Amino acid sequence: MKLIIFTGLVLFAIVSLIEAQAENEKACLPQYQVCTDAPGNCCSDLVCDCYGRYKSGARIGRNCFCLQKGVIYKRED
């Protein structure tokens, strides 16, 4: 009886550990993917950069993208 209880507890611990590890290994967002709703999900070599959208001087929204760390993007006309 003790062996059955011990085995059950060990199996429960193993399943819990596997589920916790799978939770930590969520798929990350690749470069140029939208991260507005998930700013912490960009892959490790990327950062979630956000930009405001304006029309006639009034802010109309915000866009966020997974971009390379340390890279500066400039608008070209």
Curated annotation (Swiss-Prot):
A GO molecular-function descriptor: toxin activity
Keyword Calcium: no
Key words, A-Z: Disulfide bond, Secreted, Signal, Toxin
Keyword Disulfide bond recorded: yes
GO cellular component: extracellular region
Tissues showing expression: Expressed by the venom gland.
Compartments reported by the entry: Secreted
Post-translational modification: Contains 4 disulfide bonds.
Signal peptide region: 1-20
Propeptide residue range(s): 21-26
Family, as annotated: Belongs to the neurotoxin 19 (CSTX) family. 08 (U8-Lctx) subfamily.
Protein name in UniProt: U8-lycotoxin-Ls1u
